[in-house]
């Protein structure tokens, strides 16, 4: 469950950069940290909403018409997109049509 290595590379930090920073014992940048926290927040909220990590993972990767055919995980790359995903998950949690 959770983000794959490829998704971390795509959405947070490229693997080569991550390895280079680890070798030099350097932290993530503020932007990288923000992206990592944002994606962890959405992952956690989806798991809480669906009460099932596998359902949450499938939903996060599902292309949704409501998002113009994009997957929630893709939309959540920005803070504004994350707020949209949080709103949709809130509607799902409260039983409204998402």
What are these regions (language model features)?
Residues 1-98:
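Non-transmembrane "mature" sequence context
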């Amino acid at each position: 469950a959770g983000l794959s290595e490829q998704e971390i590379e795509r959405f947070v930090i490229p693997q080569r950069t991550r390895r280079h920073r680890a070798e030099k014992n350097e932290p993530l940048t503020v932007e990288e940290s923000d992206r990592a926290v944002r994606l962890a927040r959405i992952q956690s909220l989806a798991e809480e909403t669906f009460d099932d990590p596998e359902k949450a993972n499938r939903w996060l990767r599902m292309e949704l018409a409501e998002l113009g055919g994009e997957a929630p995980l893709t939309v959540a790359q920005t803070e504004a997109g994350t707020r949209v995903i949080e709103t949709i998950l809130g509607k799902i949690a409260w039983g409204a049509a998402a």
